[in-house]
Structure formats: structure tokens, C-alpha cells
Amino acid sequence: MGSRSSTRIPVPLMLTVRVALALSCVCPTSSLDGRPLAAAGIVVTGDKAVNIYTSSQTGSIIVKLLPNMPKDKEACAKAPLEAYNRTLTTLLTPLGDSIRRIQESVTTSGGGKQGRLIGAIIGGAALGVATAAQITAASALILANQNAANILRLKESIAATNEAVHEVTDGLSQLAVAVGKMQQFVNDQFNKTAQELDCIKITQQVGVELNLYLTELTTVFGPQITSPALTQLTIQALYNLAGGNMDYLLTKLGVGNNQLSSLIGSGLITGNPILYDSQTQLLGIQVTLPSVGNLNNMRATYLETLSVSTTKGFASALVPKVVTQVGSVIEELDTSYCIETDLDLYCTRIVTFPMSPGIYSCLSGNTSACMYSKTEGALTTPYMTLKGSVIANCKMTTCRSADPPGIISQNYGEAVSLIDRQSCNVLSLDGITLRLSGEFDATYQKNISIQDSQVIVTGNLDISTELGNVNNSISNALDKLEESNSKLDKVNVKLTSTSALITYIVLTVISLVCGILSLVLACYLMYKQKAQQKTLLWLGNNTLDQMRATTKM
């Protein structure tokens, strides 16, 4: 029952994992396609699996520091074992005393518990200030007090065994594994061999191995000298103490081989000393490791930007450093709550931010929607390697091909150059020689140009320059306004009074009416004159016809 409860995933974590898994099943995802983005100076450098975790699982390792020798070889190894025992006691007694002081500082009474805890931490660690990590370590130590007491109750049987690793379950609230790195050595060298060894050789072998282990112990507990019992032990330190037997505990706690290397690199597996018994030379360590929920189909995609050439100078794309994609939705991923390893992200919570339509369109492959910020710095990265090939800004640096010999030129208006083994086998960039082995296939877009409208100002110096230009424009406008005001001041104010304006309006209306009447009268006179002309013309024609008729008669 104890081991089962120690490995249970908390309800909030289970709910988060189930919701995320349900979403991932509905919306299968693929990693962001970086092929259309590379020529625009946006490089997809890799993906990592996203996991959510909580540090909820604990188990105990009981390190058996003093090995049991075979009966027929005890006399030969007596001298080095006694010296080793004395050194162990000298080295670890301060640690044991500190553990006991902290555990005994908390009584069963209710009042002032936190104050006594802080006081014990400061007194035990000989520090002026108790850090949050030390308080956490001391709290874990106090919570493990009962388990440590149960282990001490079994110390005689643990010390008497000749097994290098075995599980201890009697009366313990959590999984405990007793391991003995030195016992493993004794078993391998003396108990499982039929070869007869002389006493001198036994003494030498035991002495050398014990000295090596003492060196490892000193390395592991070096930080404990300045802050006894309050410094966490790393997974590497735990392996030094327990040897390969550490895997037994991790396997029992549910850590698979496929997760082990990634978890070791994350630093999430830690240990805290909870007991030291100088009589039996037993060292108890409580191991804390995370409960991990794998979010299927959720991956973090890492983006890097390259300085590209534009008509406004060199510029870098404005895109998030890390994005995650589920289905057709792409959002920025906040990794401040995550611990990174080579292949995984372990996050206590998943926090994403929506992106603007422009950035979303850009990362979807529409490079004309990408926005860029001017980067005039001489140290801005002008090239980047990608899958055995190189993406370089050959206007910012000289791209020299050594095989075949020549200079790789970048076309006018082209943002960057995509260089692979088809165009160059050996490339030299700023004195760095690279042998290319990859190829950019036809799916990679090339010859992308950045328009002026895509380059904006974001840097502090550039913004200051633009503000200066705006201030100059405002000053010029103020000068024009002042000139206009001076001209207005010359205008007679009396002529612009209300009564004068009314008079001007009335006179204007009268003038317009008179003009219209004059126009109508002129039109009437013209019409009347034309009518008279037509009448006279008709009379003349009629008289002429009568005269012609009379002449004929």
C-alpha cells in the first residue's frame, strides 16, 4: 500500500494529462514545415517532445557503506576495513549530527513549528540566511523522519546481509532498496571465485577499492561540509554511491529505460540524506523523482532567425523562439516553466500565447506576411548550418567555395543563399571551413525577396532615430503654423466682425440676384431680336416673290 500511494499521480496532473491527450487525439499534429521559411531567414532547428510532470514519487536508498567479508578472509582485510571505518565515521558524523538536529527540532506541539524549523536550518547549516532550497530540503528531511526511524529499526538485518541489492519493505511507508557498492565488489572478487588469493593481495585489493570509494564519498558530500544535510544530491552522485544498483530502485518506481537517460539529463531526479548510522555504516537517502505525463502529438518546435538582406539593410525576422502546433493551430510556447533536455521538455504547466494573424500566416509558409526588424550589428549571425547544408547571408559575409574554387554570390534582392553539396563541397565562412553533405531539395523555396513594407523599426536606437525624425517634422510644422499666424495677425479684425460678415453676405446675395436678372433680360432681348430678324426676312422674301410674278406677266 505504501509503495502504491507513493507513485500515484495527483488529480490535477491526471486531469491536465487526460485533457491534453484527448485534444491530441482529436487534432493530430505534425512539426512545423521549415522548408518554405529557410530562404526567408527563419530556420527550424529541431523538435522536442512536451511532457508535464510533478515531483510526487519518492523512494529510499539505504547505502551499505561497510561490506561484509567472507569468514576466511576477514583477518586479511581487517586492517584496511578498520581504517576505512574510522575515515567514514570522521567524514559522515557531522552529516548525521545535522540530520538528527533538524529532525529533533520539530516537536509534536502545534505552536511555533515554522520558527523552530527555520532556526534549526540556520543553526544546522551555519548560515546567516536560510534559502528556499534549504527550507525545502529540511522540510523533506522532517517528513522522512518516520521512514528513517523504521529503517534504523531494521539496520542490523540490513548490515548483516551479503546481498548487494535487496528490497526492504517491512514497516516502511515507501519503497526502500538497500544497496552496497562495496558489497558488490567483495562478492565479485572473493565470494564468487574459486581462485585462492594470498592475504597480501586481498589486503591490497580491498584497500585500493575502499580508498577509491572514499574519494567518491568525499566528492559526493563535498557541498555537505559547508551546508550539512541541506544540499540535494544529484543523480550522478546517487550513481556514485550506489553504482549500477541505482537502476533497481528507479525501475521499481516506474522509470522505463526509454525515459531514464532523458530524466537523468533533466536533473529532476534528486536525493536528500535522511539518516546516517555510524555503528552499522548505513546511509539513508530519500530519492525524489517526477511523475511524468507524456502529451502525445504535442511537440515544441525551436526557431532561429538569420540576418537577411533587404533594401533597407540587414534585418531579422520577428518570430517566437519556440512554438507548438496542434492540428492547424500554432501558438507560442512559454518554456520558463519547463526543463529542457536534448529530446524532451518537462513542464510543470503548459502556457501558450496566441500569435498575430501576420506571424501565423508567416509560419504557415506565407513569407510575404513575415515582418523583420533592422539589425545593423556586426556580430549578428550571418550563417547557420542545417542538416549538412548552410544557409548564409553572402552579402554580409564572404562565402568562399574551396571545392570547387570560387566565390558564391548572392543575387540582388535575395534574402539569403541556400548552399548545399550540389553547389559546393567545402565552404569557408569567416575562416571557418565546413564540408557539406546535405542537399536542399526542390521543396525548399529559394530566391525570396523581402519588401520594404516588411521591415519595421524595433530597436531602441532605431526608435530614437525615428522619434528624432518625427520631432523634426513637428518642428517644421510648428514653423509653418507660426508663419501662418503672423500672416493672420496682419488681417483687419474689424473686417471680420459679425455685422460686417452679414453685410457682405447680403450684398453678395443682391449681386447674385441682379446678375441673374440681367442674364434673364439679356436672353429675352436676344430672343426678341432674333424674332424680328425672322419677320423682316419673311417680308423681304414675300415682296421679292410678288415682284418676280409681276415681271413675268
Swiss-Prot record:
Its main location: virion. A lipid is attached at residue 523 (S-palmitoyl cysteine). Disulfide bonds join 76-199, 338-347, 362-370, 394-399. It is found in: Virion membrane; Host cell membrane. The keyword Membrane applies. Glycans are attached at residues 85, 191, 366, 447, 471. The chain crosses the membrane at residues 501-521. The keyword Disulfide bond applies. Gene3D superfamilies: 1.10.287.2480, 6.10.10.110, Head and neck region of the ectodomain of NDV fusion glycoprotein (2.60.40.1690), Newcastle disease virus like domain (2.40.490.10). Class I viral fusion protein. Under the current model, the protein has at least 3 conformational states: pre-fusion native state, pre-hairpin intermediate state, and post-fusion hairpin state. During viral and plasma cell membrane fusion, the heptad repeat (HR) regions assume a trimer-of-hairpins structure, positioning the fusion peptide in close proximity to the C-terminal region of the ectodomain. The formation of this structure appears to drive apposition and subsequent fusion of viral and plasma cell membranes. Homotrimer of disulfide-linked F1-F2. This is Fusion glycoprotein F0. It comes from Newcastle disease virus (strain Chicken/Northern Ireland/Ulster/67). The lineage of its organism: Viruses, Riboviria, Orthornavirae, Negarnaviricota, Haploviricotina. The gene is F.
